[in-house]
């Protein structure tokens, strides 16, 4: 980046130097024209300056013509010289930068050689002043054409055309060459020639003759062919780069999916698929880079051919070709940069799945070394109890080791991050190198630790096998040895034992009986304690099971199946009741409560609260419409009047008075059908079906007949719910005894 910045500064400095050279030529021409033609020369310079400004108005990067001023003129002269001096000084110590300047700036090689005293500065110039003037006259044309060529070159490199301001895209279309006349300023050779004439002929300054416009010569055939070949090669390179970018994007997207699928399903074929995709990715990248190299080689060849064929007559065409080549190079560079960004991401993905595969293979090898013949591809692993214990111990050891390693790596990573931040800030220049060395050393330590752990497990497995074999042999040898000793000692002790047997037999029998009696008492006590404990455990488990069964019964009565109509929500409670009876077998209270459950609830089931609430809405609507109809029925006018009355009577916001809510004495005989229904609706909305049933019992006439079925179902639900609550309370009380 530093070299690129210096290169841009050098180009700008050379550009200003060329402009300064043109200004000096104009001033030299004006001063040599004599006092008689000074005013005419000054008017001529102003006209030529206007023409030059019109020709250079598209050339934004060149500074304006120098004006006679004070300090600004000095700065304008000193700045280009300082920039050129800096470029020459830097080129002295950097050969690559010197080659770059000599390649991109024509004539820079000679200037650098002269400045560095590598060759004589005025080689071939005689001491004769007249000869020097003649050579200056003859060299004006050459200098003018050289300035024209250099100015065109610098304009192509640094000038801002309309195409330079556009945003660059990664996927590039074939570029069409822009006519050189739209980008290049007017040739300064005409201005130089016009201003240079007063040097040789002062008398002709008053009436200068117009300069002859050079004729454009066509480019050589090989240059044209190279230009076409470069366009085709650039299109092919961009196409291959885009194909490679697509392959890299697909590879990055597929890596994580394939790795997750391979880890979950355990398919070995997926790893082969990843390897094939990685190979296809590398092939696509190599093809793109090969196409880019071919295009670069052709561009270099074309640059060489253009440099050889460049003249003052075909400068426009040469500059147009160079502009086209520069655009192609820029487009190829943009696509290449995007390729390398995706390539970096692909390298991370490649490391990711290869590390996963490496860890998987390491785990398989380790398990196979510990358990020979075990296949991890099987869905069910047939492991003995000892192998299972060893496997659990192995996994537990690995988990502990990985946790410690993770904590240590996290701590080290924080320290390294701090060091890296400090090194970026410039606190310590050696911190970055030290952190990198520590990182590599730590990686080697981890690698050695993994290898040592693997060796330790292998040694541990082999040692266990050898230890078991040796213990088995030692046990057999020890058993044989003990058998021989016992046989020998048996013969020796038989005689003494027989003698002492009769003497101690009575004493031993007495002691044995005493010990046996004591042990028998202890065993009986332990048996009683265990039986009591088992009884307590059984009772506690029975209480828990009873509570669970009662909870199931209560849930069946309380809640309903969501999304099912209330007519289809009926479900017999026989299974729950049988489960409670089976769990609480022998409990008189549970048996009495179960006997009190209605038979209809056992065989048919009961409507839950949601269903009764939904049915109550229908019952309330019909009962309000039939409020005036008696129980035995009436005529059609009565029905119609009752319906009209239900339409005009609205529901109050507070259907129950404060006295009723506080259970104060109240005359219920004053309530009509609508008041009763409003109060029942109030309690149904609050899930107080018992109070709602009490109010519904106050209904009379057709309304009571309509609500009779609902009252029956509500009563059945309340009875069943009361039984379930009683059983749950009994189960909870029984369970509290054994907490």
From Swiss-Prot:
Predominant location: mitochondrion
Keyword Transferase in annotation: no
Chain intervals with Basic and acidic residues compositional bias: 163-198
Membrane topology: Single-pass membrane protein
UniProt subcellular location: Mitochondrion inner membrane
Classification via Pfam families: Mitofilin
Low complexity bias: start-end ranges: 47-61, 199-212
Coiled-coil residues: 283-339
Region feature (Disordered): 23-63, 154-219
Family the UniProt entry places it in: Belongs to the MICOS complex subunit Mic60 family.
Protein name: MICOS complex subunit Mic60
Originating organism: Drosophila melanogaster (Fruit fly)
Gene label: Mitofilin
């Amino acid at each position: 980046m530093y070299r690129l910045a210096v290169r841009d500064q050098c180009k700008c400095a050379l550009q200003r130097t060329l402009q300064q050279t043109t200004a000096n030529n104009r001033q030299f021409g004006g001063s040599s024209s004599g006092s008689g033609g000074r005013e005419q020369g000054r008017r001529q310079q102003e006209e030529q300056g206007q023409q030059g400004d019109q020709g250079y108005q598209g050339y934004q990067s060149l500074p304006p013509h120098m004006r006679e001023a004070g300090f600004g003129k000095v700065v304008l002269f000193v700045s280009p010289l300082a920039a050129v001096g800096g470029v020459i000084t830097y080129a002295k110590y950097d050969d690559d930068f010197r080659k770059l300047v000599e390649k991109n700036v024509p004539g820079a090689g000679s200037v650098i050689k002269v400045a560095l005293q590598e060759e004589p500065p005025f080689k071939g110039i005689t001491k004769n002043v007249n000869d020097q003037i003649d050579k200056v006259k003859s060299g004006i044309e050459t200098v003018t054409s050289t300035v024209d060529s250099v100015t065109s070159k610098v304009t192509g490199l640094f000038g801002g055309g309309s195409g330079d301001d556009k945003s660059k895209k990664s996927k590039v279309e074939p570029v069409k060459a822009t006519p050189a006349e739209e980008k290049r300023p007017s040739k300064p050779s005409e201005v130089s020639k016009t201003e240079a004439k007063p040097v040789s002929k002062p008398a002709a300054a008053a009436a200068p003759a117009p300069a002859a416009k050079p004729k454009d010569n066509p480019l050589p055939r090989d240059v044209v062919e190279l230009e076409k070949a470069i366009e085709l090669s650039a299109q092919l390179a961009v196409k291959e780069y885009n194909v490679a970018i697509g392959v890299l994007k697909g590879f990055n997207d597929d890596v994580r999916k394939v790795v997750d699928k391979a880890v979950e399903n355990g398919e070995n074929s997926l790893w082969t698929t990843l390897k094939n995709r990685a190979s296809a990715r590398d092939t696509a990248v190599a093809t793109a880079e090969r196409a880019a190299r071919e295009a670069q080689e052709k561009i270099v060849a074309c640059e060489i051919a253009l440099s050889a064929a460049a003249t003052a007559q075909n400068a426009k065409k040469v500059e147009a070709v160079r502009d086209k080549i520069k655009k192609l190079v820029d487009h190829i560079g943009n696509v290449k940069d995007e390729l390398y960004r995706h390539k970096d991401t692909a390298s991370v993905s490649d490391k990711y799945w290869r590390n996963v595969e490496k860890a998987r293979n390491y785990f398989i090898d380790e398990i196979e070394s510990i358990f020979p013949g075990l296949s991890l591809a099987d869905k069910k692993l047939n492991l003995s109890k000892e192998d299972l214990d060893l496997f659990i111990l192995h996994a537990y050891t690995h988990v502990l080791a990985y946790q410690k390693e993770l904590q240590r790596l996290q701590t080290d990573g924080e320290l390294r991050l701090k060091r890296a931040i400090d090194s970026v800030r410039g606190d310590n220049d050696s911190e970055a190198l030290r952190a990198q060395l520590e990182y590599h050393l730590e990686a080697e330590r981890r690698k050695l630790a993994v290898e040592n752990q693997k060796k330790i497990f292998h040694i541990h497995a082999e040692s266990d096998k050898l230890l078991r074999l040796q213990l088995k042999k030692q046990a057999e040898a020890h058993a044989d040895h003990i058998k021989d000793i016992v046989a020998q000692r048996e013969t020796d002790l038989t005689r003494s034992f027989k003698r002492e047997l009769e003497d101690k037999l009575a004493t031993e029998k007495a002691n044995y009986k005493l010990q046996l009696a004591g042990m028998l008492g202890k065993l009986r006590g332990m048996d009683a304690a265990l039986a009591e404990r088992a009884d307590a455990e059984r009772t506690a488990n029975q209480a828990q099971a009873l509570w669970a069964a009662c909870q199931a019964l209560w849930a069946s009565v309380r809640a309903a199946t969501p999304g099912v109509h209330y007519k289809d929500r009926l479900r017999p409670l026989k299974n729950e009741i049988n489960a409670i009876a089976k769990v609480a077998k022998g409990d008189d209270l549970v048996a009495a409560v179960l006997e009190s459950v209605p038979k209809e609830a056992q065989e048919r089931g009961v409507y839950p609260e949601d269903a009764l609430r939904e049915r109550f809405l229908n019952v309330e609507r019909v009962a309000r419409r039939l409020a005036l109809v008696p129980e035995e029925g009436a005529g059609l006018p009565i029905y119609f009047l009752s319906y009209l009355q239900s339409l005009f009577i609205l529901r109050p916001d507070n259907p129950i008075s404060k006295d009723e809510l506080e259970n104060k004495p109240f005359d219920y005989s004053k309530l009509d059908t609508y008041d009763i229904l409003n109060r029942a609706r109030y309690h149904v909305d609050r899930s107080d079906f018992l109070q709602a049933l009490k109010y519904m019992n106050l209904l009379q006439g057709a309304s009571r007949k309509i609500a009779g079925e609902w009252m029956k179902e509500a009563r059945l639900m309340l009875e069943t719910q009361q039984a379930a609550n009683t059983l749950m309370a009994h189960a909870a009380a029984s369970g509290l005894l054994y907490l």
